[in-house]
Amino acid sequence: TLPPSSAASDVYKRQYEDNWIMVDLGISFADESMPGVDILLPDIDFIIERRDKLKGIFLTHGHEDHMGAIQYIWEKLRVPIYGSSFTIALLKKKLKEVGLLSNVKLITMYENNIINIGPFDIQPVSLTHSIPDPFSLCISTKSGTIFHTGDWKFDNNPKLGKKPNYEELK
């Protein structure tokens, strides 16, 4: 069973004027207080009502609590999804399993390549985490900048991937 929840996962909505982006779209796992429920989906009714203003979904990394709801919710949003090479590879596998891979526009982000989408300029910045290829996002508009980290840790000797980009973090 997949009930919606307002506190189920990582999903963030960012607005500038009449334009929206989402950062992450994850699931949460139910506990013993919810027998018969395996996962919880985020409540996205608010953004569904503004779907025509939604420019895209940006993923910080490939953990389920950050991207696990896409296979269940994408049909309601139908926007491009952006992520690192590793995150997109994980998402492709999930989308293929449910027959959505050919329908979803997936765009790979690269560090220091700024993505211009509507009024947003989004710059991925390398971090480290317990999964390869995570990004923080520097989201800029004419009115200012938001720095969205997602999950992270500082690891100067990662087994996979790059060290955090300390220069960009300054």
Residue ranges and their predicted role:
Residues 6, 56-66, 129:
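Histidine-centered divalent metal-coordination motifs
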Residues 16-59, 70-79, 83, 87, ...:
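Pre-active-site segment of Zn-dependent metallo-hydrolases
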Residues 66-68, 134:
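Short glycine/serine/threonine-rich phosphate/pyrophosphate-binding segments
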Residues 1-8, 12:
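Single conserved hydrophobic/aromatic residue that forms the stacking wall/gate
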Residues 13-18, 22, 135-170:
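Metal-dependent phosphodiesterase/nuclease catalytic metal-binding core
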Residues 13, 22-24, 58-59, 82, ...:
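Structured core elements
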Residues 25-28, 86, 128-130, 150-152:
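Active-site metal-binding loops of divalent metal-dependent hydrolases
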Residues 86-134, 140-142:
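Metallo-beta-lactamase
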